[in-house]
Each structure stands twice: as structure tokens, then as C-alpha cells.
Amino acid sequence: MSALEIPHFSRIVADSDFDGLCGAAILKKYTPEADIIFSHAAQIRNGSMDEYINHETVIVDLPFHQKCGWYLDHHQTNRPTDKQSIEFEQNGGVIDWQPTPSAARLAYERIKPYADLANFIDLMPFVDALDSGGITLQEFVEDGELMCFSRTLSQTEPEYMLDIVNMLVAGSTIDEIMTLPEVAKRLELQRENRKQLQQIVINNTSIVNRLAICHLENTGYSSNGYLVTATMGDSVDACCIIHGYSDGEINDANRPPLSASFYANSFIEHGQNRYDLSRLATRFDPNGGGHMNACGCRIQEPGLEHNLAEWIDMWQHRDTVLKVD
């Protein structure tokens, strides 16, 4: 793809995690005047973002939207169908879907011939590893600066995330950014929060046939799969984390609805790519999905107890129901 072939865009819609932030920053390096909106998968799929997406919008690290002009992603369940791709491209859209370790990596490879991305070179391997389950147990336990930094990123703090993007676009390295007082303060807070959260995970997790079920709903806490699987150790092959609020709303970043996240235990040998956990995420929620090793969904009617019982039953029969073909 030459610079002439890179689609024109004036807006970037990206996921609100480290991968999405880096993807957005890389794209903004190419088009500095583009504005950025951080979102999440459910908002794309339920139509909440429709008014912000048009042919001048590039979407990165989020589900496909037929009204955008350029689509970049790497999630298994987000890959457009052949029919969607044909219709989209006939209308002038460009699809870049590749099974890269991160969506930011895909953006990086597309943009690097045409923009100076030198300050991303040292950052990209970590973003790839974090998003693809490539963090080692030692790296996780050590909880280095980048691990902490990744947890400071949230849709609840869009101004902070945009500040980070603008510094990356201006050429700052991630090491320089992490020394800034407003970032260093957040890093220290995340270190303390993780100690508290690990105890909360211990107190609220049970194991059913090597599936860790962590109940964080209505607590105000959330966790990624790394913390739960590291805490439970080699006694689990995967985890299911319930989070959000019983009265939550998709468009309220501070009080999201009840949801479930599923993660393979990437810390054990052959822990990934054994079971397709996205089949759990899409069992009830047509808008659920992600990767086979890391995915999520919203709790659907008739409710959590019913959904969880079915997921446990599917897990009990995982060697036939979930086993990767």
C-alpha cells in the first residue's frame, strides 16, 4: 500500500486499551489533524457510535462498521464476512484485517513507510505481547512500568488518553511519558491497586473443573485475565470474570452493564489455542466476541445465573464443544 493508497481519514475511532491507544497514535502520526474518539466493542455494535462514523472515519481495534472508510483490526470474531467485504469495498471502503498480535502492529506496518515511527519501535513488542497473551509470568509478577502504565488507560479518562496520544505523535518515547508527574502518580496508584485487587480476586474466585470463576460484579472492580490466572496458577486452564453492574448502561463508562470476560491461562504450557473461548462469549450475546483466547460479552436475559450455568456446562464438555478444530 503506497501513501496514495492509504485512505483519507479525518477521524479515528479506537478501542480504549493500550492496543487501541497505540493504534490511534500511529494513525494520527500520519494524519495529525485527525480527531480521536475512544470507544469499546459494545458501543460499535449497538449503534451508539453511528453518528460519529462515516467514510472519513478509520476504525482500529474494534468491531467492523459498514459506514467507516477504513477498517483495521485483528480480532477473530471481528473479521468481516466475504459478503460484508465485497459490499464495503464496492462502496469505496478499505479493509485491513490481519491476525497480527495487536491491531497497533497492523497500523504500524501500514504507516511506517510514510511517517516517522521511531518512538514506537521499543514499545511495539510489549503491545504485541500484552494483547496476544505473550506476557510471561515473571513479567507479570514483576509488574514493570509498562504493565502498570497499561492499567492507567481507561475510557473513563479520555482527556488523559488523548494527552498520551498527542505526546506520542509529537515524538515522545513511552519512557519519557512515564516520567511525567501526572503519569507517575497514576503508576503508583496502579501498583497499590493491584495489591488490593489480587486479594479481592482471591476472595471472590472459585474453581470449577479447571475454570476459575471470578465474581467482581457490583463491586466497582474489574480485572484482566492475567491477574486471575496468575493468582490461581496452574490449577486452571481458563477464567471467567464477571464484572459491571446489575443496573449498568453500555454508554456509561463509569457504570457499565453486567459482563463476562473469558481468558485462557497463557502462563501454563500449551495454555493457549486449545479451546475457542469465543464460543462462550457468543453463546447468548450476538455482539460478544474477540479472540479465541481472550474475549467477552454482556450478560443476557434471563440473567447471570442462567448464562453462567450454561457456560459451565459448555466448559464441562469443552473437549467437544470448545476444542479448537
Predicted regions: what is each one?
Residues 138-196:
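Accessory alpha-helical/coil subdomains and C-terminal extensions
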